[in-house]
Amino acid sequence: MGQSSALMKTKREFVLIVATMLAIPVLVASCHARIHELTDPVDKGKVPVTISVNSLSGYSYAQTRAMVDVGEVCSNLSFCIYPCDGESFDKIQINQTREDPSFGTVSQNLTVGVHKIVVVAHNGDKNATMTNSESISFGSNTVLKTTDTFCWAGEVNVTQETGTVNVALTRATAMFRLNLTDSAIPAQVCELQFAYKGGSAAVNPFTLEGTTKSNQKESFVIQDHSRKVFEVYTFPRYEEKNGERNLSPLEITVTAIDIYGNAVKERVLENVSVNRNRITECTGEFFAGGCLEYTNIGFGGLQVEEDWAGTDNYTLPD
């Protein structure tokens, strides 16, 4: 850029447009930071760029298709563009819900230079907190905290040229599934609570790893007492010990609550392994012996079966 005040007044801009359409990819859809040059000359001082969020990768646990449209899976999108080095303006965050007529399409003018761009799709009831590009977190108005979440992050070198950036979001979460074999949930139970630690409620979209050591909680109101399946999510987190870097296991406390708020049944699942894009499934009779009983359960080996990337199965002991 020139140094004169006239040239400073004609600072080049970059137009960011996110559109759900197929286009020739000029950007590798990954969650690792890369710098991408975009190449069709346009009018001086303007840099229009189209970013197309056209699919999610890794979505195979409920369907056989490996790639699906973002609107089929997630109800919320957040796009965040971060300033170039030395710029004083704050990040620009644009949030959308599936109900928005323009879901998947946004426009924004930006300056020439290298910008970090992060895209997050999720099913939470609040927008993602994206102040730190390397630690995205989620709040909650109710009990929906960590939901199935997909990310893309990269660096785009905005020049006097234009092009299309195709974005395929990648799953960042692991799922824990409790599969009950009880004939029915006891009538006095009105809520099932999952309190778990060892995972993370925040994620680095560049590495897809959890960034915080979190205590997480999810609650399910029991309206159908024949319900068998309960699912919660976390961002797997690594810990270093004795020079080795290993995934942190979860400790999960599952508590049945009655209408008066009393805990009438509780089980503690210890040392539960979770991995990104995998389901860890625990199957068994949760209410064996009736209510008002507390049991600690330890888990050992894993059995793996392909479902997401795979399912790790445990049997709930009597």
Model-found features: residue ranges?
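A structural detector for beta-sheet-dominated domains
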Residues: 52-54, 82, 95, 111, ...
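Tryptophan-paired
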Residues: 71-131, 188-278, 310-318
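Generic recognition of cysteine residues
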Residues: 31, 74, 80, 84, ...
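Bacterial Sec-dependent N-terminal signal peptides
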Residues: 25-59, 178, 277, 282, ...
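Sec-dependent bacterial lipoprotein signal peptides
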Residues: 1-30
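Primarily secretory-pathway and cell-envelope proteins
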Residues: 31-77, 128-190, 194-196
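Compositionally biased regions
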Residues: 5-6, 31, 136, 141, ...
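Structured interaction patches on ligand/partner-binding surfaces of diverse proteins
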Residues: 33, 95-99, 124-164, 260-290
